[in-house]
Amino acid sequence: MLAELEGDGRLVLCDMEAGLGTVFRLKPAQLDIVVVVAEPSVKGIDVARRAAAMCASRARVVVIANRIREPADLEAIRAALPEHELIVVPEDPVIARADREGLAPVDL
């Protein structure tokens, strides 16, 4: 399906299942950017580092430093993935509250 959507000026953003199987089934020409989400934990950073290393030869890798609570969280991710562009998403207690209450964050 993605091959049908190829062309200049087109953007397809896929939120795929966890893991790299889907990425590796695509042809390198079908990928421009792979977004890797890194959580600030030992396991989260390790998984992100492995994913970024595996994808770097196939596409540009952008890392989302997700749920950042303090500077040390960001520094740990930055130290593990220094060669990649980094986008920071801070921890937001409204998201957790909305999830607990079964609401959309904008409804709080």
Locations of regions flagged by a protein language model:
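C-terminal boundary of histidine-terminating zinc-finger modules
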Residues: D99-L108
